[in-house]
């Protein structure tokens, strides 16, 4: 008796299992669906990752202890009133900061999303920034790298981003992904891993022309940096980026006023 028919059945069953486990090319969050079609279906895993990190970021911002910073500790501060709070997690030190940006929430979200590739023009810490793909208007994959900052040499990131309108504001979330077709043009830079990054933009109830902004980040900088060194500088880097970002929006507002 030949075993060929039985072998074929096993192969067919295995094939069916693989096909059934294929990543769904669609993602629905807050009543908005990102649909990947054609060649963009190769980014389905990245889209799934975005769904996961968005849920984590939203949970952090919605936690009843977030605004009071219960469970966080004060990490860094400056003379402009900026304060970084931190908490240690199994993946490393998570940091968060809140600030007020001098533009309406819709404009802040639009600039943050669409202005990504212009970051090196005004942020001295960013060496390069580019979109790898933008399969939908709410989901993209980007690469960017920073210059040497403090004791940390330049790092490269490849991450997927997603945003949604939530209530009268917005939430943006990002996490590192692997894109097999992407080849870095920046040899020598260590590829860091972004476990989680998120921003929440809300209109200021006392002044709708400004935006209340919360940012959270957890990253593994990789390389040979001791954990102690990373913990010492990550909050300071967040302070620097916050000050730079706020000044950027102040400059944008000034240009609009002058025009």
Curated annotation (Swiss-Prot):
One of its GO terms (molecular function) is lipid binding. The gene is strl-1. Residues 1-20 form the signal peptide. The keyword Signal applies. Transmembrane segments: none annotated. InterPro entries: StAR-like, STARD3, START-like_dom_sf, START_lipid-bd_dom. It holds the Pfam family START. This is Steroidogenic acute regulatory-like protein 1.
